[in-house]
């Protein structure tokens, strides 16, 4: 296929080589991508990497802010690697559903049947947690018992904020608990499992939950809101909730093939992943208007489309502080989009960009940030 260079605005430099789709792409998508350089520059995002796919083909590229004060020692290319943060979780959920298909784990059997619960203060409550409850964030646990990259975390005491299975409560700690069960069942570490179940089948050679030697030059540094270089941010251990590193094109393959098409899953497991499990009121004690149309499935969110009759969007965001990410999938049109960025301002463009991309006033920015 011939290469197409997307337009460059004076506000930012776009270095993009994109596969030309087989048929014309929705004009709103082209307009949204055309607006990215100005948005990236106005938000002060050093690098944003993206991939859009549809039945017509794929558009992918990266945008660099014109601001030259961002000193990035690594080469910036479409192969550059970013922290995907919580985009780690849907990949793990897909792995769990493959295990469900094989009868290796039961969605509604206690996770405690597969691994120990020694870190839990309330062991009776811990025994109520099932993979379904974990994947849909209904554990009642805090996000983390301690900083997950700290030396203290592996032995920290886990306490409940709410009763198990009583409300939506976003928790990386719950996912890490289920990770221990998956590793015990498989008799292998997380990244080895993920490579076999996801990365190799979907052609994701540079994606990993662990630090890889190639990341020394491929992994970009991240910047805080003050524009300070905070480094690549190496993590001490693989964690299914937040340590995934990838690039936009590789992650888009997972969304398209694993989630949209359900490749590697039975029809029943694929359908089950997309079922609403809980109304995702972000803060259990503080209902907000933006919560009303957001739900959680097995591993990712769903948001009802404001326009009647057009179906739902499915999504997940990632936030590791100085790295921000998001993906959006619309099964009705078989379109998907993912972006990765390397500054704490990486979500500042969400409202105008998603409005341009979808034509909808999706409440994702308010839900994530407020």
Where are the model-predicted features located?
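Sec-dependent N-terminal signal peptides
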Residues: 4-13
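C-terminal motif of bacterial Sec signal peptides marking the signal peptidase cleavage site
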Residues: 15-17
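Bacterial Sec signal peptide processing site at the extreme N-terminus
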Residues: 19-29
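Short, conserved catalytic-motif segment at the N-terminal edge
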Residues: 30-82, 104, 151-158
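Short active-site loop at a secondary-structure junction
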Residues: 43-46, 71-133, 161-173, 239-242, ...
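Short, surface-exposed loop or secondary-structure junction motifs
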Residues: 68, 122-320
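Short, gly/Ser/Thr-rich active-site loops of penicillin-recognizing serine hydrolases
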Residues: 278-285, 309, 343-370
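Short, well-ordered beta-strand elements
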Residues: 316, 324-343
């Amino acid at each position: 296929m011939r290469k197409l260079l997307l337009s460059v605005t004076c506000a930012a430099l776009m270095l993009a080589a994109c596969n030309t789709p087989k048929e014309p792409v929705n004009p709103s998508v082209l307009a949204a991508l055309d607006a990215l350089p100005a948005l990236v520059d106005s938000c002060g995002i050093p690098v944003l990497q993206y991939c859009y796919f549809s039945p017509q083909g794929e558009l992918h590229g990266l945008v660099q802010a014109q601001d030259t004060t961002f000193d990035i020692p690594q080469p910036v290319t479409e192969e550059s690697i970013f922290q995907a943060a919580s985009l780690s979780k849907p990949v793990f959920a897909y792995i769990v559903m493959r295990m469900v298909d094989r009868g290796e784990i039961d969605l509604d059997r206690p996770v405690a049947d597969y691994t120990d619960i020694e870190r839990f203060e309330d062991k009776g409550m811990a025994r109520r947690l099932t993979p379904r409850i974990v994947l849909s964030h209904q554990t009642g646990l805090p996000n983390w018992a301690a900083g997950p990259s700290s030396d203290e975390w592996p032995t920290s005491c886990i306490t409940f904020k709410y009763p198990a299975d009583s409300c939506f409560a976003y928790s990386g700690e719950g996912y890490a608990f289920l990770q221990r069960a998956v590793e015990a069942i498989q008799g292998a570490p997380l990244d080895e499992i993920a490579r076999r179940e996801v990365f190799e089948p979907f052609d994701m050679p540079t994606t990993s939950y662990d630090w890889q030697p190639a990341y020394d030059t491929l992994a970009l540094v991240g910047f805080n809101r003050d524009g300070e270089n905070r480094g690549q941010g190496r993590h001490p251990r693989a964690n299914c909730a937040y340590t995934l590193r990838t690039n936009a094109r590789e992650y888009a393959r997972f969304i398209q093939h694993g989630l949209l098409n359900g490749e590697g899953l039975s029809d029943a497991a694929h359908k089950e992943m997309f079922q609403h499990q809980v109304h995702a009121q972000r803060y259990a004690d503080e209902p907000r208007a933006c919560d009303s149309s957001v739900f959680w499935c097995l591993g990712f969110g769903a948001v009802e489309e404001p326009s009647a009759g057009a179906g739902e969007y499915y999504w997940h965001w990632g936030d590791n502080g100085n790295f921000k990410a998001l993906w959006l999938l619309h099964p009705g049109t078989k379109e998907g989009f993912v972006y990765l960025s390397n500054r704490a301002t990486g979500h500042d463009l969400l409202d105008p960009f998603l409005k341009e991309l979808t034509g909808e006033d999706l409440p994702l920015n308010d839900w994530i940030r407020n």
